[in-house]
């Protein structure tokens, strides 16, 4: 804790004052009679003697009379400022506060609409802020009067951020569950169908890059082979069997 320098310094000497008895015995405070103090309270223009002791013996300049013909005499303040009696005698006017009565406007008729209120409400309303992630990506708007077949779907253009997130998900898992697909669609503001199609196309590309056989083609060939085997086997058994008896 920091201490003051005069407490640390041992050479500091306390100031010594004379005792109280010396003040009463000596002439430090001049003794006055009780009438002296009562006269000070009664006389408002009393000034202390020290003010006059400060002045050297120069004479005060004579003051000219401020009283004109037909005017009352002016009052000189103790500091030498001239105060006219008219300013002292006339009271200051009190500020008057006039409150105008506020009459409420009559309500509009039943057939009329308050246009001013509508304009104020319209001006107070602001356009809602729509962020990019709140918008749906490439949603085709079909007119209600369209009576043709199903409109052609446009190709979805994924953003760089969406592609990056989908690539990271594909790196860890090439097949998504329904629950995970819903989570990704909600995070990237896409539909489940768009996520499903993107993963299908990405798996096809991955198989093509790694030169893997297509599972759809292989399954089709296996089904044709399994369906054609019974006919071939029956023909072979008939050819290899004994000749018919006469």
Curated annotation (Swiss-Prot):
Q: Any idea which GO molecular function terms this record carries?
A: DNA-binding transcription factor activity, RNA polymerase II-specific; RNA polymerase II cis-regulatory region sequence-specific DNA binding
**Domain of life of the source:** Eukaryota
Cellular component terms (Gene Ontology): nucleoplasm
Q: Matching InterPro entries, A to Z?
A: Antp_homeobox_Deformed_sf, HD, HD_metazoa, Homeobox_antennapedia, Homeobox_Antennapedia_CS, Homeobox_CS, Homeodomain-like_sf
**PROSITE patterns (alphabetical):** ANTENNAPEDIA, HOMEOBOX_1, HOMEOBOX_2
Which keywords fit this entry according to its UniProt record? Developmental protein, DNA-binding, Homeobox, Nucleus, Transcription, Transcription regulation
SUPFAM superfamilies per UniProt:
Homeodomain-like
Question: Looking at the record, which segments are called Disordered?
Answer: 23-125, 210-246
The DNA-binding region ranges are 151-210
For bias kind Polar residues, which ranges apply?
39-48, 112-123, 216-239
Q: In the UniProt record, does the keyword Nucleus occur?
A: yes
Q: Where is this motif: Antp-type hexapeptide?
A: 130-135
Enumerate the subcellular locations listed in this protein's record, separating them with semicolons. Answer: Nucleus
Q: Which residues form the signal peptide?
A: none
One of the protein's GO biological processes: positive regulation of transcription by RNA polymerase II
The record ties this protein, via Pfam families, to: Homeodomain
What is the role of the protein in this entry? Sequence-specific transcription factor which is part of a developmental regulatory system that provides cells with specific positional identities on the anterior-posterior axis.
Return the similarity comment: Belongs to the Antp homeobox family. Deformed subfamily.
* Name of the protein described by the UniProt record: Homeobox protein Hox-B4a
Gene symbol here is hoxb4a
């Amino acid at each position: 804790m920091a201490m003051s320098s005069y407490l640390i310094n041992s050479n500091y000497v306390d100031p010594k004052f004379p005792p109280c008895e010396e003040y009463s015995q000596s002439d430090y405070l001049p003794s006055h009679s009780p009438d002296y103090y009562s006269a000070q309270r009664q006389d408002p223009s009393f000034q202390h003697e020290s003010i006059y002791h400060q002045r050297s013996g120069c004479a005060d300049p004579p003051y000219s009379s401020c009283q004109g013909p037909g005017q009352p005499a002016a009052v000189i303040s103790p500091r030498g400022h001239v105060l006219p009696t008219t300013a002292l005698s006339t009271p200051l006017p009190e500020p008057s506060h006039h409150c105008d009565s506020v009459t409420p406007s009559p309500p509009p008729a039943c057939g009329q609409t308050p246009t001013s209120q509508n304009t104020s409400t319209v001006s107070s309303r602001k356009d809602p802020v729509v962020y990019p992630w709140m918008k749906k990506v490439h949603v085709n708007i079909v007119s209600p009067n369209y009576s043709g077949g199903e409109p052609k779907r446009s190709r979805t253009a994924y953003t760089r951020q969406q592609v990056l997130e989908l690539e990271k998900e594909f790196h860890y898992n090439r097949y998504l569950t329904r629950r995970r697909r819903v989570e990704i669609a909600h995070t990237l503001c896409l539909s489940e169908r768009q996520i499903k199609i993107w993963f299908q196309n990405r798996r096809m590309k991955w198989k093509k890059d790694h030169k893997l056989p297509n599972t759809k083609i292989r399954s089709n060939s296996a089904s044709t082979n399994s369906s054609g085997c019974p006919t071939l086997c029956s023909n072979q058994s008939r050819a290899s069997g004994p000749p018919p008896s006469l």
